[in-house]
């Protein structure tokens, strides 16, 4: 068993199987993969068949695939410099390095200082294919009363149903 699998239907009854006969059971078992499964997680199963005479067991595994986000680049447009009283654009570039498409990707930004104000703190991307690069942008302003050469920690989170990336960046 795996912490990433929830088995809903785990048994199937058959009337009889003749010697040398092969039986295919379509939609015989039902299980769900949890949302937090890591990309390329190997999930092991044990199949047990039994009758009045004895028991047969075999094992098999499947690989679960999930999106996986990685930060590629952070850019402040137009020139990577923002002075007090100015407005600029923050561009974050991410890669989906996982093996599955990510749906309804949500990027959230947070800064604790009142000197920095983002136009959008939540940015939605509908779909990001496996291996695809995507970016989010938002304008932000730095208060005119902010001290010159101040550094502000920006916390960002990128999440979809099956993956979350949390980190921070000094602005």
Locate predicted features.
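Asparagine-centered strand-capping/turn motif at beta-strand->loop junctions
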Residues: 1, 93-98
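Hydrophobic beta-strand segments
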Residues: 1, 105-109
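Intrinsically disordered, low-complexity Pro/Gly/Ser/Thr-rich segments with frequent PxxP/GP/PP motifs
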Residues: 6-37, 116-146
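Proline-enriched interdomain boundary motifs that mark the N-terminal boundary
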Residues: 7, 68-75, 118-119
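Hydrophobic core residues within well-ordered beta-strands of beta-rich domains
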Residues: 23, 43, 88-90, 134, ...
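Terminal connector regions
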Residues: 26, 30-70, 141-171
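Short acidic/proline- and small/hydrophobic-mixed sequence motifs that coincide with surface turns
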Residues: 57, 99-105, 166
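Short, solvent-exposed loop/linker segments at the N-terminal edge
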Residues: 80-86
């Amino acid at each position: 068993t795996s912490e990433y699998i929830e088995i809903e239907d785990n048994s199937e009854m058959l009337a009889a199987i003749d010697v040398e006969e092969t039986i295919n059971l379509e939609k015989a078992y039902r299980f769900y993969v949890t949302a937090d499964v890591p990309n390329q997680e190997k999930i092991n199963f044990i199949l047990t068949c039994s009758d009045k005479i004895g028991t047969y067991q075999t094992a098999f595994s499947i690989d679960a695939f999930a999106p996986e986000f990685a930060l590629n680049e952070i850019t402040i447009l137009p020139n990577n410099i923002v002075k007090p009283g100015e407005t600029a654009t923050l561009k974050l570039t991410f890669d989906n390095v996982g093996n599955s498409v990510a749906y309804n990707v949500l990027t959230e930004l947070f800064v604790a200082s009142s000197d920095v104000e983002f136009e959008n703190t939540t940015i939605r991307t509908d779909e990001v294919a496996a291996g695809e690069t995507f970016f989010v942008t938002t304008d932000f302003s730095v208060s005119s009363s902010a001290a010159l050469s101040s550094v502000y920690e920006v916390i960002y989170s990128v999440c979809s149903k099956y993956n979350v990336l949390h980190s921070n960046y000094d602005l």
